């Protein structure tokens, strides 16, 4: 049976574009559908733009494996495509003596995950690196960094186009049905609604992944995990950034905690926190800054009163609710939903940006196999 194209990707965020990039490199004619007017307008545009080392995630998990692999690929890609980035390193800080045992457990996990460039620091060594830091002990992740996420996605889009792929913005996904001879008929909405057939379908739609999977005919409802919206707000401050390195407290259940980063423009930013919400709402309540002061002063006691200014908010597609275990990413193929040629990605939150190129290779391997 002939099809209009080899593969259709739903979602032109970092992960969807990385999937398309991996497929066009393998010779797949690929089209990316994006409901917004430009690429990277969802989860990919409202995050910390941090390149993660891969410290925290359980050994053997998709997050651990694809973060470490993806980070290596990402630095190479950013350098070869002249996308702004900096391997500035990250300090994970124990601010109380009783936290040191947890810090050492993170180091053990990082080593088990194959993370390079890890160094255990005493409090004095950490303060020598970053005067003004409060630390009983710290871990230095030398391979962590920051990047221009939009520049990265623009570079991916350029590679996709150069290899014959296409990105259709303002083109919402309206549903799909499996074809008897294999493949899918994919319906689009919007002003130019149409139907196109493809051998393969990849749903990399971030917050919309569950809804998109639900519009695929015969997709089993029990194979679609619940979606929980994890909102996080960010604050910034004027003046000189206090630290050169990223600074993270010990992680809290379900998140990495409110951390500090210096972006590529030299601006200090703090966040995100975590609030489970019922609807997409990107407003920033200035009152949430009160909790930020208390959290930040645990590792930076000299944060001045009144320094924090509301910045922006993001929403993460979490697969767990408050108090529930923090699960792995879901990258589901026929073994999970029974539909050959379809890959659905659920819960691709942090470190999804870091791992995106490895995620794309993983998805391409599933379809090519």
Briefly describe each language-model feature range:
Residues 24-46:
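Glycine-rich FAD pyrophosphate-binding loop
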Residues 49-125, 135, 257:
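Dinucleotide-binding Rossmann-like beta1-alpha1 core, especially the glycine-rich loop
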Residues 5-32:
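N-terminal Rossmann-like FAD-binding beta1-loop-alpha1 element of flavoenzymes
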Residues 26, 180, 326-369:
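C-terminal lid/capping helical subdomain adjacent to the catalytic/cofactor pocket in oxidative enzymes
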Residues 22, 51, 83-86, 194-196, ...:
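Active-site substrate-recognition segment that forms the wall
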Residues 58-69, 93-102, 140-159, 168, ...:
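Short beta-strand to alpha-helix junction loop
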Residues 56, 144-146, 252-255, 342-356:
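Glycine-rich phosphate/pyrophosphate-binding beta-alpha loops
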Residues 139-200:
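Helical element adjacent to the flavin cofactor pocket in flavoenzyme catalytic cores
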């Amino acid at each position: 049976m002939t099809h209009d194209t080899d593969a259709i990707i739903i979602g032109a965020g970092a992960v969807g574009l990385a999937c398309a990039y991996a497929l066009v490199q393998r010779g797949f004619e690929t089209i990316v559908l994006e409901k917004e007017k430009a690429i990277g307008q969802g989860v990919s545009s409202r995050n910390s733009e941090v390149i993660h080392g891969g410290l925290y995630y359980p050994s053997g998990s998709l997050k651990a494996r694809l973060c470490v692999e993806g980070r290596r690929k990402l630095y190479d890609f950013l350098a070869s495509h002249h996308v702004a980035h900096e391997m500035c390193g990250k300090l994970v800080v124990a601010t109380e003596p009783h936290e040191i045992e947890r810090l050492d457990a993170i180091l053990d996990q990082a080593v088990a995950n194959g993370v390079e460039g890890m160094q255990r620091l005493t409090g004095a060594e950490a303060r020598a690196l970053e005067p003004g830091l409060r630390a009983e002990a710290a871990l230095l992740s030398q391979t962590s960094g920051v990047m221009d996420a939009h520049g990265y996605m623009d570079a991916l889009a350029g590679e996709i186009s150069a290899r014959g792929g296409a990105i259709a913005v303002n083109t919402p996904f309206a549903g799909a049905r499996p074809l008897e001879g294999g493949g899918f008929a994919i319906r689009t909405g919007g002003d130019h609604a149409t139907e196109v057939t493809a051998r393969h379908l990849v749903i990399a739609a971030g917050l919309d992944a569950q809804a998109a999977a639900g519009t695929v005919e015969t997709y089993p409802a029990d194979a679609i995990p619940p979606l929980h919206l994890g909102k996080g707000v960010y604050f910034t401050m004027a003046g000189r950034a206090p630290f050169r390195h990223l600074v993270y407290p010990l992680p809290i259940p379900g998140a990495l905690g409110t951390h500090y980063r210096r972006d590529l423009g030299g601006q200090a930013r703090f966040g995100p926190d975590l609030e489970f919400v019922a609807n997409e709402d990107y407003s920033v309540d200035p009152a949430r800054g009160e909790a930020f002061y208390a959290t930040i002063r645990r590792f930076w006691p000299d944060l001045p009163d009144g320094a924090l200014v509301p910045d922006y908010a993001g929403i993460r597609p979490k697969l767990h609710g408050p108090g529930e275990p923090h699960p792995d990413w879901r990258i589901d193929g026929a073994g999970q939903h029974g539909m050959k040629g379809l890959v659905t990605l659920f819960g691709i939150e942090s470190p999804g940006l870091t791992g995106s190129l490895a995620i794309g290779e993983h998805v391409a391997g599933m379809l090519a196999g």
